Swiss-Prot record:
Gene Ontology biological-process annotations: chromatin organization; protein ubiquitination
Gene3D superfamilies per UniProt: SRA-YDG, Zinc/RING finger domain, C3HC4 (zinc finger)
ZnF endpoints (RING-type): 109-148
Stretch list, region Disordered: 31-69
Xref: PANTHER family: E3 UBIQUITIN-PROTEIN LIGASE ORTHRUS 1-RELATED (PTHR14140:SF46), E3 UBIQUITIN-PROTEIN LIGASE UHRF-RELATED (PTHR14140)
Domain YDG as annotated: residue spans: 233-374
GO cellular component, as recorded: cytoplasm; membrane; nucleus
Topological category with respect to the lipid bilayer: Single-pass membrane protein
Ribosomal protein found in the keyword field: no
Principal cellular location given in the protein's record: nucleus
Function: E3 ubiquitin-protein ligase. May participate in methylation-dependent transcriptional regulation. Mediates ubiquitination with the E2 ubiquitin-conjugating enzyme UBC11.
Record's protein name: E3 ubiquitin-protein ligase ORTHRUS-LIKE 1
Amino acid sequence: MTRVNQLPCDCVSTAEESLTSGTCITPTHVTSLSSPLDRSGDVDPLPVSDESGGSKADESMTDADETKKRKRILSGDCEADENNKSDGEIASLNDGVDAFTAICEDLNCSLCNQLPDRPVTILCGHNFCLKCFDKWIDQGNQICATCRSTIPDKMAANPRVNSSLVSVIRYVKVAKTAGVGTANFFPFTSNQDGPENAFRTKRAKIGEENAARIYVTVPFDHFGPIPAEHDPVRNQGVLVGESWENRVECRQWGVHLPHVSCIAGQEDYGAQSVVISGGYKDDEDHGEWFLYTGRSRGRHFANEDQEFEDLNEALRVSCEMGYPVRVVRSYKDRYSAYAPKEGVRYDGVYRIEKCWRKARFPDSFKVCRYLFVRCDNEPAPWNSDESGDRPRPLPNIPELETASDLFERKESPSWDFDEAEGRWRWMKPPPANHEQRERMKMAMTCLLLFVLIILVGSSSILYQY
């Protein structure tokens, strides 16, 4: 067997080209080793130059500034940067562009390669626009357009808009247009710690009603959004997109007060809020507008025709007067792509434009139907734009051709869009709440009694003469 002798090197090695033994402290030449040394985990040494030395010797620079300057020295752009812009401007500009580019590449729709509109995120993590996703599924494709992973049947039949991703897309759009900005991130509000819990004992925990504190100061029959002046806890009001774990916590913030009923209102006064939960297959939900089915009188009347009475009449009164109705979507809505994945979510105020009755099936009982159209100044949770709603034409409803008892508003609505101010507001005075109505009734009663006393006194005086 031939033995390979390691001949001594005839050149003087530098410190970087020698390796010191850990036992005998004998330097070994790296170039003389039989196999190259694995230095993948070592940190590359910085080149020694006058500029880098000056940067290191500058005690006024922080470690972060020193690291950024060394990176520019290695890239060879130091002189050009110093001639044009300052260190902080270059760093912030480069970081912003790199972050925006990286985020856009990760968020883009797998089909149109644009920032997704009403994004749908599948299990593999890739995103689609809701329209692109529906079109992709309608073409018979049930795999991801990027990684070819299988899309589950349940997700293909009922996609859900990723409202968490909407906030990120809003931030990206603001950063792209303005460079600096803040997006509306909506917190998941929970009321589970502290004495404000909705239960105290095991018996009360079943209903979660005992000692449930109401955080806002609006009356129970308040119409429209809940502004900041009625929020003494946070001083911001209830924002569009806020979520809660259940309807009890939603009630504590005054958005929808009934624990069970999906309609909050009074027959002779109007409806203040509705909850989209469960629903029927023919209840269309397109986000900015949806079709809503009325409420039966009870379990024993489920197979009878619905009438415009009780809570159904409250919805019709809101349609007639043009009142804003708060809308809450629940995760229990199985047929909507705009329902949250968990809990309940406040989606803003809508206006009822039309209501009618129709038979759900041939020779079946009639139900009350309502057309809700969004009219809020805040953007919807699924909309990546920063602006609110604008007046839009009413959608075409095919079922109106066979509908009966169609009701449409004839007068101008109380809640309407002000072109001069560019926002939705009360164009007519809002309706008086229950306490104000009771005071008015009491005042009218006292006035009538006073007039009656005067008339009786006058008649008695005339009778004496």
